[in-house]
Amino acid sequence: DEYVGLKMKRPFVEKGTPFDLDVIGVDLDGKSVPGVPIEVKASRLDFEYKHGHYKETRVDPQTCAVTAAADPVPCRFATDKGGEYEVVATIVDAKGRANQTKLTFWVSGGDTPPSRDVKQERVQLIPDKKEYAGGETAELLVQAPFYPAEGLVTWRRSGIVKTERISLTSATTTVKVPVTDGMVPNIAVQVDIVGMAART
């Protein structure tokens, strides 16, 4: 009857920047369970081409072994390569029953498997925060379905507020922009890219 919780400080980091998260063990009532061991594993998600299809694999495993405490306990993972990482935390109660929690985070500079079809593909945007106020700097991770590519970032609120041209030499890049009072609330961001994509 014990559960493990994970909280990340931000959903992505630059390649080479350690990824930090907090780990906590609780019971059914949400109360902390100090002294219980928790194992946290992180793996990078990679894609292996076999029999005409790309298959997701987990590589470069890292382990952070902690002991639950009254307050959240920190874990840190290296990010030597870009891409998507999966974190799995496991806690085992006194009866030997395991409970797991999973989350994913992104590291700039990773690749995605190419598509077999020629179609309009989506650019994925991941903000570093859910909300921004005037005076802050917004940071967006741009995940492109192909590269190299040229892109245009457009910020809209009752018309176009700002545009920025970007060049992608990898599948991900980071865009930073200072948030002014005129951009809030409810600003929209759009990224359009053009380039070439490999086909299998």
How would you describe each model-predicted region?
Residues D1-T200:
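A structural signal for beta-strand and strand-to-loop patches characteristic of beta-rich domains
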